[in-house]
Amino acid sequence: MKLYDTIVIGAGAAGLFYGALSEPGTDSLIIDHSERPGLKLLISGSGQCNITHDGSIKDFITRYGQNGRYIRSALYGANNLSLVEFLNKNGIKTVTRDDGKIFPESLKASEILNMLIKKSEANGFPLLIKEHITDISSDDSDGTYIVKTENSSFKTKKLVIAAGGMSYPKTGSDGSLYPLIEKLGIQMIPVRPALVPIYTHSYGYRNLSGISFKAVLVRLLENNREIAAQTGDILLTHRAFSGPAILDISRYADKGHKLEINYIYPVTGQRAADMIKADFQGNSRELHTYISRIFKIPDAFAVKLIENAGICPYMKTSCTEGDEITKIAEALTCHRYAVSGTGSFSEAMVTAGGVSLDAVNLRNMESKKHSNLFFIGEVLDIDGDTGGFNLQFAYSSAMAAVKNKK
C-alpha cells in the first residue's frame, strides 16, 4: 500500500486552504465524497464569497461566541491581513465594503475556489472526489493512519480532518465522518445548527417577507434576564426572523426564550412616545401613515405592528389615546416574541458543536490523543458570526496545522 505524506479529508475551504498553504514537493492527497470540491465555498456570500472581515484581529475573538477566546493563537498566527496578502500574492485582489466585509474584487467565489484547487495541486495535493470514507484507523506499529473508502484504502503519515459540519447537507457537509472520529476516541460536542433564522409563536409577518431593518437592537431573554444582545440588520421572511443580527444571536436562542426587537434603535420607548405626541393633536392622517413617516419604517409593517398592539391602524392620528401611544412605542422599541425554535441544518450556514476544543492542541490543531492527527475548520466546535469570520477560521486553523508549532 502506498504511503502518503499527508491525507486531507474534506475539499471544503479548510481542506483546500491546507493544501494551498503547504510547501510544495509533498506526495499527498485531498479526499472528498462530494461530486465537486468547495461547493459550500461557492455559495458563500451569495456566491460572492465574503472571505474575511476588516479590523483588528483582537476584535475577532468576540465573534465566535464563548469559544472565541480559545482560538486566539490561531487567529493571531494567521490573521485577516495575512489572508488578504495570501490572496493578493495568488492573483486575487480584494475589496472592503463599508460594513467591513471583504470580498474578492471580482465578487466571484469561483475565483477563490479555482485558485485554491490549482495551488493545492501544484503543492502536491491532488483531489480525489466521489470517494465515500468508510473507516479511519491508526496503525500503532508505525504511527501511520489508514483511510478506507468504498473503493480503496490509503495509508498516510499525517491525517488532516477538514470534513466540515452538517450545515447545507446538499453541499456534502453532512456530518457523516462524526462516527469515525468518535471511533478514534476523540471527544465530540453535540452538534446543532448555527447562523439560522429564529422562529416565534404567532409570527404574523408572512405577507411582509423581504422587508428589512438596519441597525436594530435584538435581545434574547430568559425569565426576563438578558442572555444575549446584538445590533445589526434583520430581515422578515415568510416564516421567521432572519438577517445578520438574528443569525448571529441564534446560537443562544432556544424554545421558551423571548426575542425582543427595537426596530428604531437607538430610540427608546419614552423617546418614541414623545415623537408620536409631538404632532398628533389635530392630525388627520391615518395612524399607520403617521407612524411610518416619523419613524421611517415601511407602511405595510406599520399597519401590522399597530394591529399587533391591539389598535386600529386606520384611525385618525388625532384620535389616538395616551395608552395607545405607549403601546405603539413599546411595539416599536421592545416588543417581545416567544421563541418557538430555530432553523434546521438545511437552513444553517454553519454547525455549532463538533470536535471538542479540549481534544485539540489549539496552537497547531493536533489531536492530544493521537500524534499527526489534525482537525481544522468547521469540524471543530467553533462557529463564527456572519461577515467572513468562519472562512477566516478555516484559513487560520489550516495555517496553524501547516506550521505545526508544538
Task: Indicate where each model-derived feature is located.
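A glycine-rich dinucleotide-binding beta-alpha-beta segment and adjacent secondary-structure elements
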Residues: 129, 304-383
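Short hydrophobic core segments
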Residues: 7-9, 31, 133, 154-170, ...
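A conserved short coil-to-beta-strand element within the FAD-binding core of flavoproteins
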Residues: 129-143
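Beta1/beta-strand and adjacent pyrophosphate-binding region of the FAD-binding site
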Residues: 1-12
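Glycine-rich active-site loop/strand segments that organize a redox cofactor
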Residues: 48-96
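Core beta-strand elements of the Rossmann-like FAD/NAD(P) dinucleotide-binding domain
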Residues: 2-4, 149-158, 229-231
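Glycine-rich FAD pyrophosphate-binding loop
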Residues: 7, 23-46
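An anion/pyrophosphate-binding glycine-rich loop and adjacent beta-alpha core
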Residues: 35-37, 42-43, 52, 57-58, ...
